[in-house]
Amino acid sequence: MANPNEQAAQSLQTSKVIIAVNTPNGVGYFVDSEGRFLFKKQFEGVSKFTEGLACVKQNDKWGFINTQGEVVIPCIYDGARNFSEGLARVKQNRKWGFINTKGEVVIPCIYDKMSSLFLTGFSDGLARVEQNGKWGFINTKGRVVAPCIYDDARDFSEGLAYVKQNDKCGFINTQGDVVVPCIYDGA
């Protein structure tokens, strides 16, 4: 979702700076480096451009525009995050999933929660997801790498992720294999 502060991004397509501005009264718009409005349309919220697209909010729903200000992914989502590695996290009917830059669903909106990582939620190519109060991990194609069986989990760092099961801590690798069993009181 949009940050209430100004966000700047270098547009790869136009080689000019596009600044996303969100005002306290719920108006979002884009300006160039000299403060000139870039698009006629204003939104309820905006985010910076990543991979040539920016999140925009219209009628309380999120979608994406290109660097010409054209809506290329309709504003149909309850929430959205910026693109990274060709994917954007989106929310529909209180569930999270991922779409690609064409607006195609890559990972269906079936997860209650996702990693808190700012952009898409992927770390070491995996996203932490929650279903029915349990955590697991999926890859960028939506394949379950570690099933949602953990009471708690943290994002991957250097190939390992902290997991907790039955009040005991351990670690799994990026293949979902347990490398340190959940037998420890803390990590």
Residue ranges of model-derived segments:
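Residue-level detector of conserved, function-critical positions
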Residues: 2-187
